[in-house]
Amino acid sequence: MQLFASLGIEVVDISINAIGDAYAFKSREMDFTVGAIINIGSETTSVTLYNKGIVVKHSMLQLGGKNIENDIAYIFKVNNDTARKLKEKFAFAHKNHASQYEFIEVSNVYGEMIKVNQFEISEIVESRLEEILTIAKKEIRSLTSRNIDYVIVTGGTSNMANFNYIAKEVFGTIAKIGNVKLIGIRNNKYSSAVGNIAYFVSKLKLKGKEYTMVSADMIDNLISVENKNESYDSMLGKVFGFFFSE
């Protein structure tokens, strides 16, 4: 709170990521069923139980995408930055469709060039993801004895190719990968943040209040003739550039 106050920002409400995830993937089905959302973050994985779209229980696991990167770094003897790039740009979440003949050359921690096989690295990723999702499944069972109608997996790691295969192997047909569509964002990394924006907007609507992402002065500047050719190096451009730059 003190940090925001020092920046001249007034805090009017507090929300949690579990609510944001629910609003990021809100559907009519969720309003009548019991389900869970698993958000695989960098260092932790959240498991949240919902009843009719409302958060009822929440748990955190000390496992995340970093564990996958650590596995890659250890096995191939590469630094953490290289491991992250291999995970995000080359590996698959499941070995299905990974090529045994596809290689990429990278430098290891000894300065030597090594070849990394796509099928082999995908097996490593799949093994760790299976562990994370299996533990999450056990956590769901500890949170409720009721039948689960859906499991949505989100978080940056869920953007990996073939993630749907490993999710369905662990949870069956009730599993699906999150697909953030709000305000044009196409990255599950931002599901909690974007969902919380949607949640806040819905609260304002219920109160009959108007809302905007920019001030009146910014709107005037954006539509003024003298600034009509201004580049996106502005506050608004930076905000949207943050989401769409990747």
Where does each model-flagged region fall?
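Short, solvent-exposed amphipathic alpha-helical segments in soluble enzyme
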Residues: M30, A167-G172
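Glycine-rich phosphate-binding loops at beta-strand->alpha-helix junctions
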Residues: H94, I148-K168
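Residue-level signature of catalytic and energy-coupling elements of molecular machines
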Residues: F4, N39, I72, A136, ...
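Glycine-rich phosphate-binding/hydrolytic loop that grips phosphoryl groups
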Residues: K176, V180-N221
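Nucleotide/phosphate-binding catalytic cleft detector across ATP-hydrolyzing
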Residues: M1-G35, N79, K85, A93-G111, ...
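Phosphate/pyrophosphate-binding loops at sites that engage ATP/ADP/AMP, CoA/4′-phosphopantetheine
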Residues: L133, K137-D149
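Glycine-rich phosphate-binding loop plus the immediately following alpha-helix
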Residues: M1-L7, D13-I14, I54-E88
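Gly/Thr-rich phosphate-binding beta-strand-loop-beta motif of the actin/hexokinase/Hsp70
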Residues: R28-K57, I72
